[in-house]
Amino acid sequence: MDPLHTIEKVPARRNIHDRGHQGHRMGDGTPGRPKISVQQMTRFSLIIFFLSAPFVVNASTSNVFLQWAHSYADGLQQGDPCWVCGSLPVTNTMELPWWVSPLQGKDWVFFQSFIGDLKQWTGAQMTGVTRKNISEWPINKTLNEPGHDKPFSVNETRDKVIAFAIPLLDTKVFVQTSRPQNTQYRNGFLQIWDGFIWLTATKGHLSQIAPLCWEQRNHSLDNWPNTTRVMGWIPPGQCRHTILLQQRDLFATDWSQQPGLNWYAPNGTQWLCSPNLWPWLPSGWLGCCTLGIPWAQGRWVKTMEVYPYLPHVVNQGTRAIVHRNDHLPTIFMPSVGLGTVIQHIEALANFTQRALNDSLQSISLMNAEVYYMHEDILQNRMALDILTAAEGGTCALIKTECCVYIPNNSRNISLALEDTCRQIQVISSSALSLHDWIASQFSGRPSWWQKILIVLATLWSVGIALCCGLYFCRMFSQHIPQTHSIIFQQELPLSPPSQEHYQSQRDIFHSNAP
């Protein structure tokens, strides 16, 4: 029979204080349990078994953000697919940033109905519990004010408790145990020992001033050592009214008997003891707390332009993706597009180099760890084989020898690491690229419009140089023909008087001339 069925068979009128105190005896130095009368057995029967069943949401086995996202979408009643976005924790040692809206207005009427349904469900007489009626509370004049309009159900509360308790019930018998310390910090999270499990606190903040808080201070009895548990304290300025609990009040701990009651919050609510948020208050709790509905800020959208799982990777200020504004200059000036491609190729090489360096370091650490584990396992097996040689030990019997096969792949891993190191050296370069050099000159990487200005300035400089070159070439080409013509005119004069002179000379040599 599973533990849940075992719990189901617990009589409804069984006193909760009877759990796990059989080991206390009178006269041996350990405080004994006082004799319980019938009236005392029914005094706190308001707390049924599932209010004291240990349960907690294990952060390692459930994704609280996904649970919140689903509940958020269900609350919006969005039938179509949509994106649900919410704030993430600031650090890895913090949980979701929960806000708590305290119970107010008509919520107290629903809570009073919850107490009445609980009384009918258990069939118990709450004659010993005091201040259980909301008419006795300071908020009795605000019952007509609006609230969260969320009724509380005993059955829903019970189902949620059992759903949380099933994975944590490892044994069929509940035995309440004590610890030397009821408080500890694990991985940065506050934990409280409630007698069965460690309760892990969640961070919560009041979204407004709480209309009503309950405060329980340290008890004056010292018959039950190591039973107090400090849950947290809401500052006085954040509570409009505070009820100082007495011994037998609702939510209080009866210090006349050894504490053994857990006060679970109704479905949809939790106890806020600033800054800690608890699913229930364990026995012997101390602090100032209030009931409220936790919620987290969120929004929903139908479609998203950029999916949240695509990171905007940055390496030395270089973008790893092409921005949409970079496409415009590449259409009119292909040289800019070519420069962008070169830039992102360099960025890809930088990313690859960094990834290989990280992989090299992590695999090196794992290789060293596996090597030492290999040595320890080999030594342990050898020692175990020596002790259990008569029965064959943990080795394989081959004729008269005992053989153990332990694979050792550290050499292969070392070779792979050496090859990775060579690959890193191939793609590594200490020289600055053209883009980085230009960026260093500008004390930062230029944007797309700065690139256009650089290209235009370059084109203007080249154009000026070409114009100047063409001008000097033209001037030089015009100066050379004029120089040659002057030289030829001085050596061979071809003017008309010269022609007549030559003609008269030819006439002298002709004898037949007139």
UniProtKB/Swiss-Prot annotation:
Region entry Fusion peptide, spans: 328-348
Membrane topology listed for this record: Single-pass membrane protein
Annotated segments matching region Transmembrane protein: 317-514
Assigned keywords, A-Z: Cell membrane, Disulfide bond, ERV, Glycoprotein, Membrane, Transmembrane, Transmembrane helix, Transposable element
Disulfide bonds: C395-C402
Assigned protein family: Belongs to the gamma type-C retroviral envelope protein family. HERV class-I R(b) env subfamily.
Gene this protein is translated from: ERVPABLB-1
InterPro entries found in the cross-reference section: TLV/ENV_coat_polyprotein
Transmembrane parts of this sequence: 452-472
Mod. after translation: The CXXC motif is highly conserved across a broad range of retroviral envelope proteins. It is thought to participate in the formation of a labile disulfide bond possibly with the CX6CC motif present in the transmembrane domain.
Pfam family, one: TLV_coat
Record motif CKS-17, residues: 378-394
CDD domains for the chain: HERV-Rb-like_HR1-HR2
GO cellular component terms, semicolon-separated: plasma membrane
Glycosylation sites: N58, N133, N140, N155, N218, N226, N267, N350, N357, N408, N412
Domains: entry comment: Contains the CKS-17 immunosuppressive domain present in many retroviral envelope proteins. As a synthetic peptide, it inhibits immune function in vitro and in vivo.
Domain of life: Eukaryota
Record protein name field: Endogenous retrovirus group PABLB member 1 Env polyprotein
Span list, region Surface protein: 60-316
Stated role: Retroviral envelope proteins mediate receptor recognition and membrane fusion during early infection. Endogenous envelope proteins may have kept, lost or modified their original function during evolution. This endogenous envelope protein has lost its original fusogenic properties.
